[in-house]
Each structure stands twice: as structure tokens, then as C-alpha cells.
Amino acid sequence: MKSHIQSLLEQTIESFKQQGILPADFEARIQVDRTKDKSHGDLATNVAMMLTKAAGKNPRELAQLIIDNLPASAYVAKVEIAGPGFINFFIDDSALANQLQAAIGDEHLGIKLPAPQTVVVDYSSPNLAKEMHVGHLRSTIIGDSVVRTLEFLGHKVIRQNHVGDWGTQFGMLLAYMEELRAANGEQAQLELSDLETFYRAAKLRFDESAEFATRARQLVVALQSGDEYCNKLWREFNDISLSHCHEVYERLGVSLTRADVHGESAYNADLEQVVNDLAAKGLLTESNGAKVVFQEEFRTKEGEPLPVIIQKADGGYLYATTDLAAMRYRSNVLKADRVLYFVDLRQALHFQQVFSLAKLAKFVREDMSLEHLGFGTMNGEDGRPFKTRTGGVVKLVDLLDEANTRALELVRSKNPDMDEATLAEIARVVGISAVKYADLSKNRTSDYIFSFEQMLSFEGNTAPYLLYAYTRVAGIFKRATDVDLSQAKIVLEHEKEKDLGNKLAQFGEILSRVVDKGQPHVLCGYLYELAGAFSSFYEACPVLAADNDEQKHSRLLLSQLTASTLQKGLNLLGIETLERM
């Protein structure tokens, strides 16, 4: 509905250009917002006030002119001017009912799909040297929610798990694995549970033994040169590490697969060409033996030029080099329209520099959008980055285990007579959902406090509340098994029916915001408001005990669409629903 009103206004402004009321080359920014006070209509715009200078008219006069020239629309019951020149639109109840009717049974819930784009989404991307920890959670689940929503809206999505599977640390790891094999024979295996121990032991040997450090550096050179023995060990290590990652993904309900892994090593053969091309374009400068690029717009606080280091003095490459190669691949091979990077906000400057350089060097098409969708940190209740009691990094599997244990206690306390298998399944869903939703419901760019107590509450904007809200709506149909709704029609008469209908009609607008800005918290807030709107409707408008069959069937259809929207919305967040709690 919002986009429909925007279209009416765009048509009107275009006619003003043709009539000479506005300059022919005038670019208008039209904003339509939902009103908070329904006495002021359903939607409002301040476009008349924005155009007053260009049109040479006072805002109220221009507002009336806009109203007089609006194309006819069955969706609009009336239009009024308010205050200094706001234009308020009142939506026709029967038109809204028809829109909701069309959404029932439609796989996209009546949402008009945008023109499809090819969108590359770079998310999760852990280093393969260690087990996944809580620091990987935000990129993984925020990215996955946006991916799911993009696909639901008809876009072609290419997932890219840009894992850290290359670099100098792998020489250290290979050297230590080599020592273990020498001591324990070819049967020695690195167990998943030993990843952290293995890394720490290798680092300790590297720091304490000059001989070991020399061997590690030799193995890096051999690995980069394509040595078969080193590559075999490297692949084995990566396989073990990736297996761990994908166990975590499966447990989290994340859609990443092995086929989506396209790590740093995938661009090894392209790095020399990146350097050569930058040199050929006259962009490279030598600084202390390193090859760097200076861009005028990037300077330190003291005004000194801030370089992008492309190649170190010893010939090694850096993240910037790999990122430039990846951008070129995503532009020229994957043909992306947008590339979204879900990476910590602390990398903002890095991405600003490499995005700018990629465009400057013409490594990417001018029309390809490069977007760093950064995020804040997960903090403990002391406001500091989330750690174990001993100050260590919290492993993601340990966090999920704790969530499951707490959820099981919670569900058992509410269902003391439930069988263990059902308890375990409900606890699994509630525990994982609580962790994911607590993160997704926060503004992506904000830090947030991690609290098991808050996230497992059945009150407020939490996963348990929404999961219960869904089971409550779906439960109506367990008591209405003999009702035929095939010929039923939605009729909006009661104010709470209209409120629920208006909220249901906003689903498409909300999803557009999720994919345009990479902000799943907007969807979380919407689902919470939808659950509240249904609760108010259910209290005020008897469903199964309605006054007559027509009213009963209409309210059942509203309930059905609410259940479908809640379920789809939670699914887009990567959250399973339950039929009972």
C-alpha cells in the first residue's frame, strides 16, 4: 500500500513537470510514512513542503494541487491536508480486505516482487585455524537472515563464505602437524575438540623455538609454491576445520554449505595480477620497500596520507590484495549487482579504502554496489566483550550447549508431564531460537548485552514469546477442523480487525527494508508488533464464537494469514516454529 501511494505521487509530480509547474529536470524525493494517529489517516507525506520552493507556491496550496491531480485509486478512501501542508491518505477498508484476501494461499503472501538482482553475500567467514567462537555469531546469522529474505523476494543470491584458509599462520600449523606425524605416525589425527589446543601448542612452539619458526616459514613458502606434501597437509587441516564449522552451521540452522566456501586461497593465482594491474595504471607507490596505494581522500588525523598496503617488502600479500581480487571476481565472473559484506564495524576504514580503490582501478563495474554492512559487538553483562569466567574466548558450541540446557529446564518447568523426546525437541528449538533472536532483534550497528535470562523470557520481544504467539494462532485451527474457508471472504468491520489487517499489509515494506539496509531487527520488531496486534484482535473479536458464519470465517482467514506471516517471518530469520510448547 505504501508503494502504491508513492507511485500515485510520482505520477502526479511527473504531470507537474509536463505542465511546467515543476522544472523538467527536477528530481523529487518522495517519502511516505505510516501515521501514528489513525485520525490523521493511514499514510502521510510531506512532499508538498519539499516541493514548495521549486514550484514557487506555499505548501498548503501545493498540497491541494497535488490532491486535485492524483490519479484515481480504489485503495484510497479520502485524502486530507493537515497542518502546514502534510497530505494524509485514508485507505479504503474493502480495498485493504481484497489485498489481504489475495495474500492468502500465495507463496509470497501477496508481496509484489521487485526486479531481480544478482546479490553476492559475504558472511560468516571464520579463520580455519580455530574453532568458531561467539565473535562469529553475528556475521553468520545476520548474513543468513538477509540471504533468506533476498531469496524470498526473488533475487539470485550467491553465498560466499570467505574463510581464512591461507596466510603465514598456516606454516606454523603445518610445522606442528608435521611434528605430531613424526612422533605418532601417519595415523595421528587432529580431533575437532583439539583445534584450540592444537593452535595454542603450535603458537607456543613458534614463539619458543627459532628452529621451529624457521621451519614454519619454509613451509609457508613451500605451500605458496604448490608443494604437494604441504598442500596435502593443508587440505587435511582445512577439511577438519570446515567439518567443525558446518556442524555449527547445521546446529544454528544456517543455510551455508561446503559449496559456498570460497576462501582466501581461491584468489592466490590472482594476486600477482592485482599488483601488476595497479602498477600499470600508475597507482602503486613504493614505501619502505612495500608496494602501496595512496588515495587523496584517506588521511590520518594529522593529515598524513593513509596507504593501502598491497604487497609487503618481503613479497607477501595482505587482506587488501585478496579483497581486491575477490571484488574483481565477483564483478566480472559472478556478475553481481550488489556485494554485501557482513563484517565487524571495526573494519569500516579497510572497506572504505578497498571499495574506493576497486572503483578507481576499474576492477569492478561502475554500477556494482559494494556495501559493508558492519555490526557491533556482543558484550557480557559487565558491558565488555563476552568472555568465559577465566577471560577466555567463548566457543560457539559451548554457548549453544548452555542455551539448550537452560531452555530444557525452562520447558520442563512449564510442562512437567511432557515426555523426554518432545521436551528435548522443543528445548532445542527454543534454545537456538533464543540465541539467534536476541542478536537479530538488536540494531545491527549497535553493541548489545548478552543475557540468557532476558532471551529466554516469555515476555517482551523474544523468541519464546513469538514462538508461543505462533502456536497460539495456529492452535485455533486445531479447534476448527470442520470449517470450510474455500469461499470465505475477509470483511474488516471492527477497529481491531482493521488494525490487524493494516499490520499484515506492511509485511512487504518491512522485507524491503531488511534487504535494502541489511537490518533483520526491523523484521523482528514487526513480528513482535504483529503478535501484539493479533492478541488485541483476539481479545476484542471472538473468532470461533463470532456472531455469524460470515464473521467467523473472515476472522479465521485473518488468523490464518497472521499464522502464515509469523511463520514466514520467523523462517526468514532462520528460526523454526513449533506446533506446541
UniProtKB/Swiss-Prot annotation:
Monomer. It is found in: Cytoplasm. It comes from Shewanella oneidensis (strain ATCC 700550 / JCM 31522 / CIP 106686 / LMG 19005 / NCIMB 14063 / MR-1). Belongs to the class-I aminoacyl-tRNA synthetase family. This is Arginine--tRNA ligase. Keywords: Aminoacyl-tRNA synthetase, ATP-binding, Cytoplasm, Ligase, Nucleotide-binding, Protein biosynthesis. SMART domains: Arg_tRNA_synt_N, DALR_1. One of its GO terms (cellular component) is cytoplasm. It comes from the Bacteria. The keyword Protein biosynthesis applies. A motif ('HIGH' region) lies at residues 126-136. It catalyses: tRNA(Arg) + L-arginine + ATP = L-arginyl-tRNA(Arg) + AMP + diphosphate. One of its GO terms (biological process) is arginyl-tRNA aminoacylation.
